[in-house]
Amino acid sequence: MASSLKKLISSFLLVLYSTTIIVASSESRCRRFTSIISFGDSIADTGNILHLSDVNHLPQTAFFPYGESFFHPPSGRASDGRLIIDFIAEFLGLPYVPPYFGSQNVSFEQGINFAVYGATALDRAYFVAKGIESDFTNVSLGVQLDIFKQILPNLCASSSRDCREMLGDSLILMGEIGGNDFFYPSSEGKSINETKLQDLIIKAISSAIVDLIALGGKTFLVPGGFPAGCSAACLTQYQNATEEDYDPLTGCIPRLNELGEHDNEQLKTELKRLQKLYPDVNIIYADYHNSLYRFYQEPAKYGFKNKPLAACCGVGGKYNFTIGKECGYEGVSYCQNPSEYVNWDGYHLTEAAYQKMAEGILNGPYATPAFDWSCLGSGTVDT
């Protein structure tokens, strides 16, 4: 009897211990971030594309009305104002993260942003080998990471603090990245194995995280993709779809959103695997999909117009979007109240949408695990 009781108690303690470990590993630990290091594409690009472009062939984001709600002279951001990364910086009390390209004095204190408009998760060689040669940037996620590794010794040499410690105190924003990997083949009408491509994208993101952990990275915010089936650009591309293809509530195309959600689930699975391998690291998934999708479901609740699919800046068609006549081109108009719009230019969102998304990620249900801000002396986010 005593032996059976002893076994029962031992089993109970083992279950209790295992449960404790699982709970602990699913919670983020509070950290006072001293900088933001960013990788990705146009969703986080704070101006790199401007400095990488030929002065005679500047991108649309170099022209008015980009930046008209906040920065005024266009900063290269693909919006009328601030991006999610900007609202994160504001909340943390940090400077807006400057673009790496074109910066004179790069430092951990300022933060560093390698994200580039049009960037892909996979290297350019992958697409060229498949006959996809769109006019897109060569600064893939791998290239961005290589540049960071090259400049890291110089960054650390300018400070008395340990290099690993400085990176450990940084919030590393890994994306969003991967959407362009699907967009470029689609825009050229190329057939691709979507499952295989998504596997390669996730592998590239995972590999980058592991490399940064080896360098001292401790906290990663890894966003999933947007609901592409609600994008004005995608809706215009699929405008010949039948009525049954659309969600009667939102007007989005569920099939496209479901594909994106499947990809996001795969990414989350990989992040959970990494979290188990590196229990001392915080890997936080940012649910960009659902953080944005709620605006299409209940636009008025969040302060948007009742028809949230149309672009604020654009011309023509049901969604105020025409390929070849996008925002920033001569003769293309923009709305006078961008804060009431979700979509800015057909591809990207307004500052108002990005702000509400940032709030939902920093202090809402759209980060897994949720951020712990207890060491900041505040339990709520005010962006």
UniProtKB/Swiss-Prot annotation:
The keyword Transmembrane helix does not apply. The active site is at residues 42, 345, 348. Keywords: Glycoprotein, Hydrolase, Lipid degradation, Lipid metabolism, Secreted, Signal. Belongs to the 'GDSL' lipolytic enzyme family. It is found in: Secreted. It comes from the Eukaryota. This is GDSL esterase/lipase At1g28660. GO terms for biological process: lipid catabolic process. Glycans are attached at residues 105, 138, 193, 240, 320. It holds the Pfam family Lipase_GDSL.
